[in-house]
A protein has these predicted regions:
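Short, solvent-exposed amphipathic alpha-helical segments in soluble enzyme
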Residues: 9-13, 37-39, 88-92, 114-119, ...
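Generic secondary-structure microfeatures
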Residues: 76, 102-105
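Short acidic, glycine/serine/threonine-rich loops at helix termini
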Residues: 4-8, 31-36, 109-114
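Thiamine diphosphate
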Residues: 1-31, 71, 78-85
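Generic secondary-structure signature for well-ordered alpha-helical cores
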Residues: 14-17, 27-28, 34, 65-70, ...
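Conserved thiamine diphosphate
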Residues: 37-93
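Flexible, low-complexity linker and terminal segments
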Residues: 104-187
Length: 187
C-alpha cells in the first residue's frame, strides 16, 4: 500500500470510491526478508538498509486526508476497543475510508516471540505510531495520548539496537515534532 499499488489507492481516493481499505502496516516488505519500504521508520535497520533508513516514514493517513476522504484513521491491536470502534464507524460511512493498522513483524523487527503486542502498545504510547482519526480530511482527533519516551519502544527491537544516544534523541525530537503537529491539527 505504501509503495506498490499506491497509485491505484490514490486514484480511488480522488474519486471517493465506496471502499473500506484496511492497510496492515508492518513497516517494511516482510514477505521478502524484511526489506525497507516507505513505511519503514527513520533509523530502522532492514535487509536493504543495514545501516538504518535515512528518511522518515511516509504519512499515508495524512495523504489520504489530503484527498479529502470521509474517513482515515490509524489503529493498533494493543488498543482493541479503539480499533473496533473505528472499524464499525468506517463500515457505517460511504466513500473511501482507510484504516491503517500497525502489525508488528516478529522476525522483521527482531522481537522476542511473545513481544508483538508489547511492541504495538509501546509504539502507540511512545508516539512512534500515533493513533488518531481524520474525518473529511479536516477534523483530527487523537485517540490515545503519548505517555512514554521512544527509547522504551526501541530497546525491545533488534532493528534499532545499533542506535547511539544522539540518534535516539534525534528520533525522540522527530516524534515530538510529529506529535505537536497532530495536536495543532486537532484544534
Amino acid at each position: 500500500t505504501y509503495d506498490i499499488g499506491f497509485q491505484c489507492l490514490s486514484s480511488a481516493a480522488e474519486r471517493n470510491e465506496n471502499i473500506l481499505y484496511i492497510c496492515f502496516d508492518n513497516e517494511g516488505y516482510m514477505n521478502t526478508g524484511a526489506q525497507k519500504s516507505s513505511s519503514t521508520p527513520l533509523y530502522a535497520r532492514t535487509a536493504s538498509t543495514p545501516a538504518g533508513k535515512t528518511t522518515r516514514k511516509k504519512d499515508l493517513t495524512g495523504i489520504m486526508a489530503a484527498h479529502g476522504v470521509p474517513y482515515a484513521a490509524t489503529a493498533s491491536a494493543a488498543h482493541m476497543n479503539d480499533m473496533r470502534r473505528k472499524i464499525d464507524k468506517a463500515k457505517s460511512m460511504h466513500g473511501l475510508r482507510m484504516l491503517t493498522l500497525l502489525i508488528p513483524c516478529i522476525p522483521g523487527w527482531g522481537l522476542a516471540d511473545d513481544a508483538g503486542l508489547v511492541a504495538a502498545r509501546l509504539a502507540v504510547e511512545s508516539g512512534a505510531f500515533p493513533v488518531y482519526e481524520i474525518e473529511d480530511g479536516e477534523r483530527y482527533t487523537i485517540n490515545v495520548p503519548k505517555t512514554r519516551p521512544v527509547a522504551e519502544y526501541l530497546k525491545i527491537q533488534r532493528r534499532y539496537r545499533s542506535l547511539d544516544a544522539d540518534e535516539i534523541e534525534a528520533l525522540q525530537l522527530e516524534i515530538d515534532a510529529g506529535w505537536a503537529r497532530l495536536e495543532r491539527l486537532e484544534r
